[in-house]
Each structure stands twice: as structure tokens, then as C-alpha cells.
């Protein structure tokens, strides 16, 4: 047994010595199989599509927080006289602006106060990818002018959507219209008025070059109707009310859109033992099966959310419907 232990120890010493002797400086030299070069990635149409996909994802993440409680899209109403955060069991929510609200109230994210931070951090991410498309699209040689302008129009939409919310929520902010290639710390704010003038200019280009939904083979990405709707909102901000009215009239009358006034689509009965449903148009409008179908004339541009494709929890009822069983509301 003693001889065996000595033999094992001897073998371990020999192996360790061999490993130390064979490890040289060349062993530590990097040998990467590839390098990430934006100039190579985004000068192909597949690279542009990947950046545009990140813009589409950013639009969804900007509106849908997914933390199980509050939603960014609902937070836009919490800061107005339209509504109040309905999750009354949270213990803290924006129901007393005079005493509770500060410039950064709820901005830490993930809490129950609001989800305004999503419009800030995810807005900048969407702006970054939109600027990436705009910076490289002219270098993609395989694109004809029509397709090139479609990419530009969709990128303008995503950049405008990010800045629309940021400028209205936070006021004067830095205006970034190109890729930041080196660290930058000397940002300066641009007036909200100047930002919206740029958004109007960009969206007018988008309306002229992004195809209508009827001319697109798929749903869930930016269409002409969405560009028109965002341009209408920007016209209202800049005080160009006649242009907003004319654009809205065009959108309604010439793009097959209208308010639904009768039941349509698939009948989803729900759980009759919990709440028996008498079919009506409002019920049908809020069934997931009916959101993106051709019969639904209220949908301008759907945001697709599937378990197989970057699913994000969407707790709309948690944020918008009062928790009646809690004593906080009494």
C-alpha cells in the first residue's frame, strides 16, 4: 500500500512538471476565430434586418415592462388626470403628486410606482439601432432605391417613437442622430421644439416611403399607417392642427380603418363557470385571436408577442383593474 501511494505521488509530480514545462507565453496568445466589425455586419441586408428586428423588439419592450405589476404604457395615464394605478395592494403609487412626485419618482425601475424608466433606457436603445440602420443603409449595394427608402422610413419611425416619448416626458434632452463611435461625456440638451421639428420632417419621409399594410406580406413591423398615426401626434405637438386633421382623415378614409361596431372574428367564450360571457364587440376586440386578423379594422399596427418569439409578460389587468379585495382603496 505504501509503495502504491509513493507511485501515485510520483506520477502526480511528473504530470505537474510536464504541464508547467509545456505552458509557454504563446499558449496565452489570443486566437479569435472572427472579429465583430460593424462595417462588415451592417453593410449587408441581413445585417440591416437584424438591426431593424432590434428596433421592433425595442418598441415592444418600451411599452411592456413585464415585471408582473406595472406597465410603461399604463404609466403614461398614471401621470395624468385620466387614471390611477389600479394595483391598490402595492402600498405605494402615484396618487398624491403634491407630496409624492419628484423628478425621479419611480425611475429606479422594477418597482410599483411607475415604469417611466422604460421610456428612457429602452428609448435610447431603439434610437441607437435606428441610427445604425440610417448610418449604414446607403452602403448596402444590393438594395434598390425603393427598398433603401423603406429601411430609412422604418428607422425614422423607430427613432421618432423613442424621441416622441422622451421629449414629452423629460423635456429638453440630447439629440443623437448618428452612431456614437467613441466615449462621449459632453452631451448637451436640445430643445423639445427643435426635436419635434426633426421628427415631423423624418416622419413625412416615412409616410411617403414605407408601404401600407395591404402591400406588406407580413404583420408586426412598421407600416405606412403607423407612420401616419405618429406623424399626426407630432403635428399636434407642433401646433399644426390642420395637417393633423388632414392626415387623420386620409388615414381613416383611405386605409380601411374604422371603429368596430359589431362582434367579429373568433368567439372565445372564456370560463363560463367564473363569468358567463354574452358576446359583444368589446369582448371580441380584446381577444388575442382577433387582434391581427383582417376583419379587425381598428388595428393600425399590431405588436406581436408569442412565447416562441421574445415573449414579454403583459400584465395589463394587474395595472389597470382595481384590486377590490384590498383595504387600501377604502
Question: Language-model features: where?
Answer:
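Bacterial N-terminal signal peptides that target proteins for export
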Residues: 2-11
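An aromatic- and glycine-enriched ligand-binding surface/loop that stacks and positions planar moieties
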Residues: 24-92, 225, 231, 235-330
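Short linear capping/connector segments at secondary-structure termini
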Residues: 33-37, 177-184
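Conserved, well-structured interaction surfaces
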Residues: 45-67, 87-170, 186, 190-194, ...
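Outer-membrane beta-barrel proteins
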Residues: 121, 213-224, 237, 326
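Short coil/turn linking the two alpha-helices of tandem helical-hairpin repeats
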Residues: 167-168, 174, 237-240
